[in-house]
């Protein structure tokens, strides 16, 4: 409850009385709603597409890996409000704050990872590390936000080099196969 724009009290569920506008106003954030922030892409629900598709946002999704490759990552961050007072009064733009923290955290984790790990078996580890970093950033800001999940939607090489990347992968598989055949022949 705000009185003349200044925080006065937090009320509990049930019957509560407050002085009518313009003296007191009540802010009621949805603390049970799970919010979703998409990074690297915009879905139909975000941008008003009628085609049912998604639009890529390269300035958010292109990241440099630890082995100096570029990877295109789309991911979603799911979050809830854990402290309504902090959420309403400690940060001005909660969604912008979550987005900035998520981009920063993912770039930090990707910069420490190799491209092979990012594209194959390391996704769960990357998601967990990213979630921990986002939460620590939001806790530093006293935001009142709890990150519940980070979910990688897509992780691919950029479109311009995807064919060359697949050729390299096929060559590595052929090398492994030839090596295994040679070892089998030697035994």
Residue ranges: model-predicted function:
Residues 86-91, 127-128, 159-161:
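Solvent-exposed, non-transmembrane alpha-helical starts
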Residues 107, 135-143, 169:
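Signal for well-folded cores of large energy- and translation-related assemblies
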Residues 97, 105-129, 138:
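A short, surface-exposed, charged and often Trp/Pro-enriched helix-loop connector in the C-terminal portion
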Residues 91-99, 103, 123, 127, ...:
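Short, charged, low-complexity patches
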Residues 115-120, 140-152:
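Short beta-strand elements
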Residues 157-187:
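Long, charge-rich amphipathic alpha-helical coiled-coil "stalk/tentacle" segments
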Residues 1-110:
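Hydrophobic membrane-anchoring helix/hairpin
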